[in-house]
C-alpha cells in the first residue's frame, strides 16, 4: 500500500496515524538487545491484551510518564497506593489486573536478569541469537515456548499471542510483509 511519502508499508500500518507510521518505520521488527527497551515493550504488550496496538501506541507517552520511564526497579517496587494512582490515571489503560501484572512481571523480569545477566540474553537464547523470518501468524512454536517459560516463572498476560506480538515488536521475529519497503528475505 503506497503512502503519502511514496513508500509501500505493511497493510496494518494506519496511514492516517503518524505515531503508527513512525512505529512501523523505526521500531517494529528492529532487533532490540537493550533490557530497558525490552521491558518497556513487554509492559506495553501486556496492556495491549484485548485491545488494539494502535490504542496502546497512542497512549505510550502517558504510559512512559506513569510508569517512571519504564524503570524496572521502580515499577517492581510499586505499592498499593501507587497502583491505585495508576488506576485513576486517565492517560493510560486503567485495568487493575494489568497494572498488578506489570508490577509483578517487573520483579520476575529482574530475576531473569539475575539468572542470565540480561533479559536480552534470556530472550535471544530461544533462537540461538538469530532473527526468525515469518509472516501471517499470530503465534508460533517459538512464542509457545517463550510464553510457557514466562508463565512458569510467574508472569501474567504473557500468552502465546501476546508473546508473538512482543517477539515481532522487538525484532526476534521479523514479519514485514512482502512489498513493504522494510521487507527482508531470509
Predicted segment positions?
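HhH-family (HhH-GPD) DNA N-glycosylase catalytic core used in base-excision repair
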Residues: 1-186
Amino acid at each position: 500500500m503506497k503512502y503519502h511519502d511514496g513508500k509501500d508499508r505493511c497493510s496494518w500500518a494506519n496511514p492516517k496515524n503518524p505515531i503508527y507510521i513512525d512505529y512501523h518505520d523505526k521500531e517494529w521488527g528492529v532487533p532490540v538487545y537493550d533490557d530497558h527497551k525490552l521491558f518497556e515493550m513487554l509492559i506495553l504488550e501486556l496492556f495491549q491484551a484485548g485491545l488494539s496496538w494502535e490504542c496502546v501506541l497512542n497512549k505510550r507517552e502517558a504510559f512512559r510518564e506513569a510508569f517512571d520511564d519504564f524503570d524496572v526497579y521502580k515499577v517492581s517496587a510499586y505499592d498499593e497506593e501507587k497502583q491505585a494512582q495508576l488506576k485513576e490515571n486517565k492517560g493510560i489503560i486503567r485495568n487493575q489486573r494489568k497494572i498488578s501484572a506489570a508490577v509483578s512481571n517487573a520483579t520476575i523480569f529482574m530475576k531473569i536478569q539475575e539468572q542470565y545477566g540480561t533479559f536480552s540474553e534470556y530472550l535471544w537464547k530461544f533462537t540461538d541469537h538469530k532473527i526468525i523470518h515469518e509472516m501471517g501468524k499470530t503465534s508460533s512454536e517459538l512464542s509457545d515456548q517463550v510464553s510457557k517459560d514466562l508463565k512458569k516463572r510467574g508472569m501474567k498476560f504473557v500468552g502465546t499471542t501476546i508473546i508473538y506480538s512482543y517477539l515481532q515488536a522487538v525484532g526476534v521475529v521479523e514479519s514485514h510483509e512482502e512489498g513493504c519497503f522494510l521487507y527482508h528475505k531470509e
